C-alpha cells in the first residue's frame, strides 16, 4: 500500500502543474512552426509583435503576456550574485497568471522601465528582513539600476514557469529595440493568450493564417519562410509539450505508474482474499459459537467487513508513515 500511496502522490503532483491558476483553462501558449527550404523548427516562441496584434485584431482575446528568460548577474552593493534565474515580463503578467503579490500593486509593478518584482525567497536573499520596496539592484551586464516595485509569493513547485524575479518588459525593449512590438522578424517572445469565456481555441486558430498574411505575409515570402502559429493549452505544457527548454514531465509515465499501482492493488486484494479464505477454516468454530448465540448472517457479514476495513485503514496509516520517512535519515 505504501508503494501505491507514493505512486498516487507522484501522479497527482505531475498532473497538477499550472492548475493553481484560476484562469488556467483559458490560457494558451502561442507556439510556432518555422518552415524554411531546409528544415522545420518547432519552437515555443513567437515574434514580439504577434500577441499585441492578436489582442488588437480579435475580440476573442481578453489579454496577453510575454516573457523572456535570462540568467543575469545581479549586484547589490559590492556583492555579485551570478546566473540568477530572471524573466523579463509584460505588466499584464499578474492579470493572466495567479502569481500573488504580497507587496506592491499588480497592475503597475511591471509597468515602468527599470522596475523589478522579486519572490519572497529572492527578497530575503538580497535584503534579509528589510522592506525591499524602493530598494535598488544592479543588472551587472549593462550596469542598469532597477527598483524593486513588488514582492510576490514564491512560485509553486508545480509551475512550468520557474524564476525568482521579473523585470519590466520596457526595460528589455529599452536596451534591445524600442519598436519591438512592431517587429515581425524577431522570434524571442514566449507569449501567452488569455481567451474570453466561451472562445473556441480551434476556431481562433483557423483565423491565424489570414492574420499572419495580412501583417507579414510579404516579408515571410521574401525570406522564403513559412510561419505557422498555433495554441498550446497551459495545462498541457508540462506533461505533453515537446517544445521549449522548460522542465517537462511525461504523460505516458503517469499512465504506466498508474497501471503499476492498480496491478499492485489487485495483487494485494488477491493475497488478502487468499489469506482470508485460509483463515476461514480456523474461524469456523468461532462462527458456529456466534450462531449458537443467535448471530445471524447479516451480523456475521458486517463483522467480517468491519474487520477488513479496519485492517485496510491500519495498513493505510502505516503506509502514510512509511512514505513520509526521510530516506536521508
PLM feature segments, named:
Residues 1, 292-296, 315, 319, ...:
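A short glycine-centered flexible hinge/capping loop motif at secondary-structure junctions
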Residues 9, 230, 309-329:
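Small-residue-rich transmembrane alpha-helices
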Residues 246-264:
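N-terminal membrane-entry
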